[in-house]
Amino acid sequence: MDLADYRALSFDCYGTLIDWEAGIAAVLGPWAREVGLDLDDERLLAAYADGEAAVERDRPTAPYPEVLAVAFRRAGEGLGRTVDDAWAGRLGASVPDWPAFPDSADALASLATHYRLLIVSNVHRAGFAASNRRLGARFAAVITAEDVRAYKPAGDHFRALLRTLDDLGIARGELLHVAQSLFHDHVPARKAGLRSVWINRRHDRPGWGATPAPSEPVGYDLEFPSLAAFAAAADAAFAAR
């Protein structure tokens, strides 16, 4: 597989470019201590993961801040504790505070010299705009849950992506989808007939973190431990031309 054969990259944002696990844990951790739970971040994120996926499935048109708040309450119930309105609202409003991964901005800048960049994200428009101030990237298109009124792994984002590719004059076979989540991204990307690159941000940690384990067969074409490693591979591929 030659990375120089492609013209465009579509990215998941949260988990791939923005460290949503750090952002979520920054709220769940203090809450857990307040309510007397002695749980580390990994256990809190695991408790949270299935709740968010269920809310996104059950309330596909809900704004993402509402999804976060309701998922937090469900996680609390599962842990035998109450999440009050203040804590739920704190998580719901936290997206602009979530940090970018240290390599994201530089890697995107490098990749932009070779490809058109697009975003395919489970977020509201204002949330992504705030996150992109940390990334400093220019995207040819941004497709959010607010736009398609659904959340991945439902296929709506990818149907919108294919329409957007047509508008940009890019063939399906000229795009790679780049993402961390097997559950949210690689399963539906493969169903949409797209090739994909797994940015395995959790390569040095066990478990799935804030993401559910994939419930269907999943495939991807390349795997890298970081976005920086992927960008370096792309640079090398184009340099070899």
Language-model segments: which ranges?
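Asp-based, Mg2+/Mn2+-dependent phosphohydrolase catalytic module
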Residues: M1-Y6, A105, A109, R116-R241
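N-terminal helical cap/lid subdomain that shapes the substrate entry/recognition surface
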Residues: D2-P102, T113
